[in-house]
Amino acid sequence: MNKIRLPPDVEFHEDIRLLVYRPRGLVNKEAVNKIITVIGELETTLKEPFDRFSDTAAADAVDLNFEYIIRVSLYRRSVYGNRPPTKSAILATDSTLIHYGKVHALLTQGSPIKVRVFQDRKEAAQWLNVPIERLTPNSASSET
């Protein structure tokens, strides 16, 4: 795990096998490509599967389209292949991100990647079977 350098908006909790992604500002193709690369590197490096949590609460703009979301979803489905099941929870309140998350969930149905979109952090924590504190941003971080 220590071979992979994670971007500032990504955390990996080895003890609970959970990747947490917190995009800030604009969510665009560059941001999505970056997290896809990180997930791919972790999947290649780690021996055990891990769940994902995308917290889009700090995203204030979206520059994506359905064609791109479809391509990403089909790519992830194909690349993940027949690996063990994994969960991907997307916390979203922005209507565009909710719709894109639901498209991603639909296109990964039937694969080992189980995607659900949540508007409530507590529900996401319950589905992922992790303490809600692990999904809550650290307000004491370097945001001063």
Task: Go through the PLM ranges and name each one.
Residues 1-144:
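Amphipathic, Lys/Arg-enriched alpha-helical "gate/interface" segment within cytosolic domains
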